[in-house]
């Protein structure tokens, strides 16, 4: 039996982070977590990390699609926060967003990690961006590193 598992260190990889400006007070924590993991665990240099700010989560997919066609990056990380309001707008965003991102990843054979929070309230978002429940930006970074390395050995 053969077992394959991607490692976390990927010091020569180039990563693009696409991050939403909306809810930036939360998203900046996600970004800090992602960058820390890429540098400290993945051993990436700052010059191998590119950050693209977009207005909101809905604008992330077009940049992901554009960057995936350039063959410049080994992996992409998406960061943002969608907090449930009084309408069902958040449900539409979450379903469509994930489907679009997953389709791009499969079509372009590029690891794309989703570090977008979908929460019921602001407290849940804060907890997932670096307090009680860890940092989902860091988790997204580790996931993309592992997938980059797994694809290299398959």
UniProtKB/Swiss-Prot annotation:
A GO cellular component annotation in the UniProt record: cytosol
Question: Does the record's keyword annotation contain Secreted?
Answer: no
Give me the reactions it catalyses.
(2S)-2-hydroxy-3-oxobutyl phosphate + 5-amino-6-(D-ribitylamino)uracil = 6,7-dimethyl-8-(1-D-ribityl)lumazine + phosphate + 2 H2O + H(+)
Name a Pfam family for this protein.
DMRL_synthase
The cross-references to InterPro entries, in alphabetical order and at most eight, read: LS, LS/RS, LS/RS_sf
Which residue windows are transmembrane per the record? none
The molecular function GO annotations come to: 6,7-dimethyl-8-ribityllumazine synthase activity
Active site at which residues? 89
Instruction: Specify which residues bind 5-amino-6-(D-ribitylamino)uracil according to the UniProt entry for this protein.
Output: 22, 57-59, 81-83, 114
Please tell me where (2S)-2-hydroxy-3-oxobutyl phosphate binds in this chain: 86-87, 128
What pathway is this protein a component of? Cofactor biosynthesis; riboflavin biosynthesis; riboflavin from 2-hydroxy-3-oxobutyl phosphate and 5-amino-6-(D-ribitylamino)uracil: step 1/2
Specify the domain of life of the species encoding this protein. Bacteria
Q: What is its EC number?
A: 2.5.1.78
Provide the GO biological process annotations: riboflavin biosynthetic process
Q: What does this protein do?
A: Catalyzes the formation of 6,7-dimethyl-8-ribityllumazine by condensation of 5-amino-6-(D-ribitylamino)uracil with 3,4-dihydroxy-2-butanone 4-phosphate. This is the penultimate step in the biosynthesis of riboflavin.
Q: Which NCBIfam families match?
A: lumazine-synth, PRK00061.1-4
Q: What is its quaternary makeup? A: Forms an icosahedral capsid composed of 60 subunits, arranged as a dodecamer of pentamers.
Xref: HAMAP family: Lumazine_synth
The family note in this entry says: Belongs to the DMRL synthase family.
According to UniProt, the name of this protein is 6,7-dimethyl-8-ribityllumazine synthase
